[in-house]
Curated annotation (Swiss-Prot):
The keyword rRNA-binding does not apply. GO terms for cellular component: ATP-independent citrate lyase complex; cytoplasm. The gene is citE. It is an enzyme of class 4 (lyase). SUPFAM superfamilies: Phosphoenolpyruvate/pyruvate domain (SSF51621). Mg(2+) binds at E129, D156. GO terms for molecular function: citrate (pro-3S)-lyase activity; citryl-CoA lyase activity; magnesium ion binding. Binds 1 Mg(2+) ion per subunit. Substrate binds at R66, E129. It comes from the Bacteria. This is Citrate lyase subunit beta.
């Protein structure tokens, strides 16, 4: 499976970006019908995204749509449009509880049945944006087999906490809570956006923090951030060589019917082998010096 490190937000009302965003090289494009779209443009943006999702050039890249919350006048209409158009994943903003996911899942399944899509083919992502969402992160992450990822969204979260964006200290607990919930549920976790697009040094510092904590990637707001993020997540040649040795040792042990895998006198267990396979998968997109 192709790694999903970068998810690039594309404003749903920006027809020019909708028609070209597949060329930027992000692992996934995330059409935004929520915060990036004004109230008067909601209907137009929904139609533009509906049309973009059906374009042949988007068939080779993962598509995600951030809909409006279901308790707004726009959320259900967004969902009807994007599921019928064949979106790969729906991102639900402001997810506070497992019930939010259950409601979303019920609507998605109904729409799939009505339009003839394979039931279960539309994946879900929960965006956690409040103290309540952080507290309920584990139950949210386990709420549905459709849920492929959870993401932390910083702006609403820090507002809810009565603080503001700073050096990252204000997000540390939430990051750890979301990560632990994702790992317990066996799904991916995505870090917050870095909105200061001209501060490359700051972006790289936060991207390295996200990687070192264990996030699978980040949501992005500018195409210039894609290659920077991919370089952060790219393994080194030494890491790739070691991973290949681990995989070879595991395959040899399996061929010989051995129950124990060892490499250079050290025992190798399942998690190490799984990690090696992930390193090799990442290396297909580039290797750092």
């Amino acid at each position: 499976m192709k790694p999903r490190r970068s998810m690039l937000f594309i404003p749903g009302a920006n027809a020019a970006m909708l028609s070209t965003s597949f060329v930027y090289g992000a692992d996934a494009v995330m059409f935004d019908l929520e915060d990036a779209v004004s109230l008067r443009e909601k209907d137009t943006a929904r139609l533009l995204v509906y049309q973009a999702l059906q374009h042949p050039l988007y068939q080779d890249i993962e598509t995600v749509v951030r809909i409006n919350p279901l308790n707004t006048p726009f959320g259900l209409a967004d969902l009807e449009a994007v599921v019928r158009a064949g979106v790969d994943m729906v991102r639900l903003p402001k997810t506070d509880s497992k019930e939010d996911i259950h409601e979303l899942e019920a609507h998605v399944e109904r729409i799939e049945r009505e339009c003839g899509r394979e039931v279960g083919s539309t994946k879900l992502m929960a965006a956690i944006e409040s103290a309540l969402g952080v507290v309920n992160a584990v139950e949210i992450a386990r709420a549905s087999p459709r849920l492929a990822a959870i993401a932390l969204a910083a702006f609403d979260y820090v507002m809810d906490m009565g603080t503001s964006r700073g050096d990252g200290t204000e997000l540390f607990y939430a990051r750890c809570a979301v990560l632990h919930a994702a790992r317990v549920a066996g799904i991916a976790a995505y870090d917050v956006v870095w909105s200061d697009i001209n501060n490359e040094e700051g972006f790289l510092a936060e991207a390295n923090l996200a990687k070192n904590l264990g996030f699978n990637g980040k949501s992005l707001v500018n195409p210039r951030q894609i290659e920077l993020l991919h370089q952060v997540y790219a393994p080194t040649r030494k890491e790739v060589d070691h991973a290949l040795e681990v995989i070879a040792a595991a395959e040899e042990a399996e061929t010989r019917g051995l129950g124990v895998v060892s490499l250079n006198g050290k025992m190798i267990d399942g998690p190490i082998i799984d990690h090696a396979r992930k390193v090799v998968a990442l290396s297909a997109s580039g290797i750092r010096d």
